[in-house]
Curated annotation (Swiss-Prot):
<comment type="similarity">
    <text>Belongs to the Thz kinase family.</text>
</comment>
<keyword id="KW-0460">Magnesium</keyword>
<dbReference type="GO" id="GO:0005829">
    <property type="term" value="C:cytosol"/>
</dbReference>
<dbReference type="GO" id="GO:0009228">
    <property type="term" value="P:thiamine biosynthetic process"/>
</dbReference>
<dbReference type="GO" id="GO:0009229">
    <property type="term" value="P:thiamine diphosphate biosynthetic process"/>
</dbReference>
<keyword id="KW-0418">Kinase</keyword>
<protein>
    <recommendedName>
        <fullName>Hydroxyethylthiazole kinase</fullName>
        <ecNumber>2.7.1.50</ecNumber>
    </recommendedName>
</protein>
<dbReference type="GO" id="GO:0000287">
    <property type="term" value="F:magnesium ion binding"/>
</dbReference>
<keyword id="KW-0479">Metal-binding</keyword>
<comment type="pathway">
    <text>Cofactor biosynthesis; thiamine diphosphate biosynthesis; 4-methyl-5-(2-phosphoethyl)-thiazole from 5-(2-hydroxyethyl)-4-methylthiazole: step 1/1.</text>
</comment>
<dbReference type="GO" id="GO:0004417">
    <property type="term" value="F:hydroxyethylthiazole kinase activity"/>
</dbReference>
<feature type="binding site">
    <location>
        <position position="167"/>
    </location>
    <ligand>
        <name>ATP</name>
    </ligand>
</feature>
<feature type="binding site">
    <location>
        <position position="194"/>
    </location>
    <ligand>
        <name>substrate</name>
    </ligand>
</feature>
<keyword id="KW-0808">Transferase</keyword>
<comment type="function">
    <text>Catalyzes the phosphorylation of the hydroxyl group of 4-methyl-5-beta-hydroxyethylthiazole (THZ).</text>
</comment>
<dbReference type="GO" id="GO:0008972">
    <property type="term" value="F:phosphomethylpyrimidine kinase activity"/>
</dbReference>
<dbReference type="GO" id="GO:0008902">
    <property type="term" value="F:hydroxymethylpyrimidine kinase activity"/>
</dbReference>
Amino acid sequence: MNMEDAARGIELVRKQKPLVHNMTNNVVTNFTANGLLALGASPVMAYAREEAADMAKIAGALVLNIGTLSRESVEAMIIAGKSANEHGVPVIFDPVGAGATPFRTESAQAIMRKVKVSAVRGNAAEIANTLGEDWLIKGVDAGEESGDRTELAKKAAKLWDTAVIITGAEDVITDGTKTYTVGNGHQLLTKVTGTGCLFTSVIGAFCAVEKDVCRAAVSAAAFYGTAAELAAAKTESRGPGSFQIEFLNQLAAVEAMDIKERGRIREVE
């Protein structure tokens, strides 16, 4: 995948303005909606099980996020996911905090069993625990890493037959056959709640306009990381509050040329 391909994703999103159905958590709903609007997508936040299936079938992508889960919300997500599957809508799953509690882990695993997911995005601990492997987790954040993230991503992608995105200082993205790392981003992303969840929804927007899910995820990661770098360059001395606002500005401002110039994408074996 070359830089030209990676840069094309944001142009397609802005041209097509895909509807992204987010069943996300109540900590990040506003930030996620604003982020998607900034980059050019059309977000909808619909959680009720009574309309979950109907909304999912008309969306360009469905994003499931268990950050503030309940039994009822998981049931609604599964209903929406099955509807998306029936209508050819890509499903992006964020198993937030999988491994932190048995209920959270079991819920993540239930969604993976009952819904055909196109891509899973999480930190190494979340992916490992959803897979059924032990990996240290602290709250909903990854603990000290003790394994090979690339091999973990490949294993998960092959077992689930889906694209896997493991985020960190360097993102690992694989469909089990092709594997990439994306080195764009900034540590200030870790100081603003919801940036990981928004990234999952951004992947959803890119998957809505690009059928190759792995390609879409790489393109989304390069775009998202570039926006973070440019926002940090303008606000780093002022802290995370200023960064958060400027990051939304950069999601709207980053162009394909910025990604071509700054993108750090590498294919690995």
